[in-house]
Amino acid sequence: MIRVATVADCVQNPPRNGVACGRGFTVEHMSKGEQMQEQKMPVVAVVLAAGFGTRFDENNPKQLVSVGGKPIVCWSIEAFENNDRISDIIVVVNERVEETVNELIDEAGYAKVRAIVPGGAERVDSTLAALDLLKQTGIPSGAKILIHDGVRPFVEERSIDGCIDSLDQFNAATVAYASTDTILLTEDLGDRKVVKSVPERPNTFRAQTPQAFRFGTIVKAYELAAADPDFHPTDDTRVVVDYLPDEPVAIVDGSETNLKITTPSDMPIAEGIARSLDPEHAKEEAKARMHAVFAEAFSQMHSR
C-alpha cells in the first residue's frame, strides 16, 4: 500500500537518489552541482480530490462515485498516468477516504503515483499541502506542475500536452473553454443583482483544469497571497493573476467534455461521455446507427 505522505515525513526522511515520500519521486534532492536525470525537469500532476460534498452519497465523496464502471478519481489519475510526459503524480485526498483511495491506486497499479497527501478544508489548503510536500523533496523551481480537479474525469490528452508545452514559453497556463454564451458581469443594487458590463464574447472563457505553473512561480504567488487577509481564491490561476499581475497566463484549449462533476444532475452527461470513450461501446453504437440507416432505407423502398 502507498502510505500517506506528510511534510514531516519528508523532513525526517529526505529523498535520496530520486526516492522521496510514498513510492518515491523521480525528482532528486538536488545539491549543488547535481542535475536531473537525463537533464529533464520533472512534470508533476497534482490531482485534488479532497472535497467531501455529500450530495451524491452521505458516506462517500463524489470523487469515489462510479462513472462508466470506474470511480471518478480514477479517471482523473489515469489521464496523467497514461501521458508519457508526466513523470510523477500526487493525489490529495480527504483523510476520511484515504485508505479507500490507497486501495484503488494499488489495485489499478498506477505506477506514477508517488504520494497521497491529506488535504485541507478548502481547495487552497489542498494545493498548499501538495506544494509543501514538493518543497521538501527539493524539486527545482523550474519543474512543471499541473494542478487538476479530481472531479474532472475526462480531461483530454491534448489539453495536458498543451499545458506542458505552454510552460516552455510562459510560467503559467490554464485550460479554458471558449464561452458560447454571452457573459454578464454584475454588481449589487439594493437586494438585486444588475448588469454592470458585458465583455466581448471572443474574450470570455470558462476556466477548467489542469492549471499549470513553473514550481517557483506558483510558490511565489502563494507566498504573496499568504500575507493578504482577504485571500480567498477559487482556483490556482486566480492566485497568479491577483498576486503576480505582470505574469501572463496562457490559455490552453479545453473542451465541453472536460466537465466538473458537481451535482447528481451532471451524472447522465458524465455517463454518456464515459460510454463514448469505450471503444467497444462506440463500435456497437456505430453498428446500431448503420442498421438504423439501412432499416430506414429498406422501409422507404418498400413503401413506394
What kind of region is each of these model predictions?
Residues 106-143, 237:
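Short phosphate-binding loop-to-helix
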Residues 47, 73, 130, 149, ...:
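Residue-level signal for inorganic ion chemistry
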Residues 141, 154-252, 293-304:
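Conserved core of the sugar-phosphate nucleotidyltransferase
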Residues 2, 31-46, 50, 235-237, ...:
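SAM-dependent methyltransferases
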Residues 37-100:
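N-terminal glycine-rich phosphate-binding loop and ensuing alpha1 helix
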Residues 144-148:
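Short aromatic-hydrophobic micro-motifs that form the base-stacking/packing surface
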